[in-house]
Amino acid sequence: MSSGYLTVCVVGAGPRGLAVLERICANERQAASRTAVTVHVVDRARPGPGRVWRTDQSPHLLMNTVASQVTAHTDASVAMEGPVRAGPSLYEWAVSLAEGGSSRVAASGRESGFLAEAAALGPDSYPSRALYGCYLEEAFDRTVATAPAHVRVVTHRSLAVALDGEASEAQTLTLADGTRLTGLDAVVLAQGHVPALNSPGEERLARESRARGLVHILPANPADVDLSAVRPGEAVLLRGLGLNFFDHMALLTLGRGGRFERSGGRLVYRPSGREPRLYAGSRRGVPYHARGENEKGAHGRHLPVLLTEETIARLHRRSVDGERLHFGTDLWPLIAKEVESVYYAALLGARGEGSGVKEFTDRYLAAPPGGAEQDLLDAYAVAPAERWDWERISRPYGDRVFAGRDDFRDWLLGHLARDVSEARSGNVSGPLKAALDVLRDLRNEIRIAVDHGRVEGNSYRDDLQGWYTPLNAFLSIGPPLSRIEEMIALLESGVLDVLGPGMNVVIENGSRESGGGASFVATSDRVGGPPVRAAVLIEARLPEPDIRRTADPLLAYLLATGQARPYLIDGACGTSYETGGLAVTERPYRVVDAEGRAHPRRFAYGVPTEAVHWVTAAGIRPGVNSAILGDADALARTVLRLEPAPAPADEPAAQDSDFSQALA
């Protein structure tokens, strides 16, 4: 241990900020690096859940991960140098909460609701986001309470707005409440989703909507949206059919007092009369696939047989040698083959051909694409209708054009019923959901393969961001099957209608036939019939992470002052693709300024670095070598090895008395 003091600031107190704090405490507990360590944690929301997982949001908003596969704690699977400090998964914590209660939950004002949810929660249940927030609050409290005696944690319920300091000197962080945290030896940005400015197109539509007296709700977390202006019975357009759509669907039905009941084996919606009339659509025109019922337990996952560590290392060597990878030719064939092999293995297993499954899988993985694969499927009597078809799965309606909304609704109800049936078959036993779950299980491998510009810029933009990422979301990170059942019930009740593929929305002035006044007018490219007119349009999606349009004052300040820049990916012929991600180095993720210099005392990981890293919004899973926890440990250990920074020449060294202490 060296004598002296170290002062660190973590900006963002959600799951990533909590992980960094916990890793600092765990490493200091194992071997103290200093006489005293002070960690400032800055977030205007309560530390632990942060804003996204706050405990006062609607109980109708669910996670899309089962309770046993959610954690905030390290385990032996995490590849890291620091010590393991085990803790309960969300499910294990909920069991203890139901049995013994919690002072933190008791203080929430919603104790009875949380205790009832915890008591009913199973390992494969989907918890409310608010309950996860309670879990994170307790994890933060426990981390602070068990911190080594020489580690002091100071929380600041404010927003960071500016960061200054040369690379050779202590850093100064300014908060919105006027507090200046000086003498910082390191600053870690651990932010999640941050607010964004409107795109030019969004701003034009918002401005025109206001001028016409229409309600246009821009992309946002549904928990943050005020829906009080939406009147019972009025037509509401929702643009988007992903997870955000299902949140709005729940808030505008269950949140308005409606109920779902089982009747004759089917789910039926009992309206309250306070619901609006919902019309939803998107470019694809169908909702995300339901998640298959979990058969993998807490830690199970598909282990790659093609996209292995050895394969990724070989691809990386090519990248180091100057040969940029192309997602469509270097990675997609491996991903597709893995998915297809799992599908056929489950299909043959469901037919009772268990003894021949391994031989088939080995032969299929070795077969070149095309005729050899089809010959093998013929040999195993896999009928053409049973064969995997990426086009059919991604566009289940094919080239069909529907006569009208009734025609499309009938088709959609059949499609959704099949999706529910497939989901009930499970993510191991059910061929379709077992295959789609491979996409989720391969995220870590894909992330390792593509991160830090290893894929050529144009391919990253077009093949990965433009094509595969939305396809992956549609197929593998959808809602619980209960949400699809609810959607069916709402369609059958008439509360919800889906417009179909190729949704288009414009603003038109009213006509005598439409009752006068301006309205949003929605149509579908593939569904005939009259357009839908509404005075409310909800953009049912989150803003895309893009620091060039960030409304976060700290990130905007760093960008405006040249202390940060967007991440560039080298492309073909000397070009580069400018992403919306915050540029950082490889692990431990030092922030890079406008001149390309890495700052030795500033670090960042999380959603703002999307494009440097792929799919940064994924959560922390136990037992599968969580990238977030490994990153947090590397960040913590790097910070703890830093030499204390000298104060700027024009500013005296900070004293402990300078710091506000608002431990919550």
Question: What are the roles of these predicted feature ranges?
Answer:
Residues M1-Q57, A106-R110, L115-E643, D650, ...:
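Flavin (primarily FAD) cofactor-binding/catalytic cores of flavoenzymes
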